[in-house]
């Protein structure tokens, strides 16, 4: 029996959402999960087996499942899940373009910056230089 019937459920119109499953998996990062949804392979390289390849989804669908669908499942679609006027200004900046790297590298993506409610909460570039996290403008 196929495991993680994501594509079957998605095509049937089910509201499919996904999470990292941390602490069951090695990291809370969503990127290995997104990679696995597309490749149907273990993103940690413990196995070369492709599990139920017919249940794979494409990268845009995997991202939608983690973002918009997550907001719908959590009943916050008016404020979260996508970048739109009137919604919370929550977003991240990544170290690479997900659509320009091999799908098998998506699990290795790193977040460079996290912005929540329009305020920088994490800036890897600033923290690596010993600078402030980006909260210099306290007037916001």
Placement of each model-derived feature along the sequence:
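Extracellular/periplasmic ectodomains of large secreted or surface enzymes and adhesion receptors
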Residues: 124-140
